[in-house]
Amino acid sequence: VFLYLLLLHFKLPVFYSVIISIGITFLSPQLARMPGHFSLSYVFAIPAMLYLIAKFDQRNRYCISVIIGLFVLWALGTHVYMLGFHASIIMLYWIFKFLYNKETCKNRKNYLHLAIQFIGPLIIFIAFTAFTDPVSDRTAYPWGFLFYRAYPESIFLPLGKPYAQFLLNFSDFKYINWEGIAFVGIVASIGFLIAIVFFIIYIAKNRLKSFPQPSEKYMMNVFFWASLIMLLYSFGIPFIIGDASQLIHYLGPLKQMRGIARFSWLFFYMINIFIFYHIWNLRKKGLNRVIWVILLVLTTSFLYYDAYINVRFWSKQVNNSIPALNDHQNRTDENMWLKEIDISNFQATIPIPYFHVGSENIWVNATCGITRPTYLVSWKTGLPTMGVMLSRTSISQTLENIELFNEPYRRPAILNKLIPGKSYLIVTIDDCIDIPPIQKKMIDKSIVLYQSDDFSLYECPWDSLVSVHNNPFYEILFEINEEELFAYGDYLTDHSVMNFQIESFSENSGDDYYIIPGSYSVRLQKGSWIYHKDIPNFEAGTEYIISFWVNDLRKDLFMRSRFELQLRDSLNQGHDAWKPELFRNVKAFDGNWALIERSFHFKNPGDIIRWHITNNDLRRTEYTVSHIMIRPSHTNIYRKGDGWLMKNNRFFMP
């Protein structure tokens, strides 16, 4: 409706406005958000703001400003990206107005209008969020700012369209994330190319003595240039130029809107309005009537064909019928499991394999298709789930959740926040092979309730959940006292030959260390390597494990640092390298310390290990390493301390 009204505002006839507005609506990239990010699929949101601003410019009424302000509040409560769209329209409108009309700057009423339209609603939203959000440690650096960006190809090329398969002969376009696709339509693409040609001719003739006006409509020009600015921003400009990516750190809260490709949507609407407006007005500029009619038919047909392809594709995604959910009375065979369990016995569901995505610091990705049965069981039972698939979750809460499903070490803090004595409902897939040992142990200690090819349900009693995290201190003490071990300095090993290396940094005594005094601090920048050579009784081809404790686990962005490990020969030439994110090698947590562990294979006698942790976004930040251990995977290393026992770099206390 608002597209139609906007076209009428620009003096296009009713029947043409109806036809074009329908075509643009069904071509909209916002339809792609119906299968997910549903609140971003409100196709009216951007055209409505364009229409309201156009009407405000025409009438300059406070009532329109109030409507705009209320609309911004609605946008803020719907999805924060809606604020981004509306803010870009409102603020760029006022910037153009202030720049090109000096009288506007002098009129104090205009500042009041701006306050009503945008500043006031924004302040209300910030205040409301500050008073209602109990979480204070969400990430300030969400991942993907330059990954979820648009490309000229994703905007102007008909990628994936039946008539453009030949484009795959030039590139597979795999570097384009689906978030970046906002095809404007073949008509708008060709029209924009022609507009660029005319723009170049204009510059050649006028040498930019006056600012180019794409149309005779002032507001269309304002919206066009505003949309073009946002298109460039969606490409990642200026951040993709040289080393300008560091500028992202100065964006403040704007960093939270990491899906910058979405800002190309404003351009999608405006370039289509702009092109079809000019096509209609070609007749007034002297184009032959027959040619004009043919052009109208062809361009409108192509618009509808592109729209049809878009709708046909996304309709299949939206029509995602799940029979089990459609059975509201739970009478079908696939919902019979509900009659076999007493929901009141459980406090939540636990998906195994466990998944937790959302903190932007640590990812535990879902495997074995566990998300579908997890959501299904949670939906049917009404039980909350401990599985997480969100964004901007609390970093501390994330660590508490993940700690429960990591290998046993310290008693998980989250156990003190759960309801003691009440069971958990485990949702799992029996033939999944990607289940970590501790989670397998949870299943082994649970009671089978239901099994099928799709998923299985187990009752995990409270005592069973707690027992998998029992302190192994006395088990390790038994191993030390009863097994045949060999002493090498302060350490004991079950191997008769010393074949491990310890770096405790004992010469660097200070307050910042883990259990054993000694640590090493260095900046998160390239070049600060830690070397290990002359491994005793080196065994080529044997699996080795390097482990160490590192501080700053809870610092935002730190666990996204890269742990770069290299193997180099005796001539210092590299032959193997790994560069995973730090969180992918975390084995245990303890306060602000994390145990990092990775396996590798030596290949040649005299191989040297070197490694460091880097983070371009935290390059001036120091990290602290404590107690590095390199050992063959078949060898266990022990040590007794004052009130603690160590096994394979894990320190246990009674």
Language-model-detected regions and their locations in the chain:
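Membrane-embedded helix bundles of polyisoprenyl
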Residues: 1-10, 15-57, 61-98, 117-125, ...
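Signature aromatic-anchored transmembrane alpha helix within multi-pass, membrane-resident enzymes
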Residues: 91, 118-119, 273, 279-308
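Extracytoplasmic
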Residues: 305-531, 539-541, 614-622, 630-638, ...
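Hydrophobic alpha-helical membrane-interfacial segments at the cytosolic entry of transmembrane helices
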Residues: 71, 105-131, 142-147, 222-227
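Membrane-helix boundary/interfacial segments in multi-pass membrane proteins
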Residues: 32-40, 151, 170-176, 180, ...
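Perimembrane helix-loop-helix junctions
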Residues: 84-119, 199-209
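Periplasmic/ER-lumenal interhelical loops and adjacent helix-loop junctions
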Residues: 124-200, 606
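Extracellular carbohydrate recognition and processing domains
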Residues: 573-608, 618-620
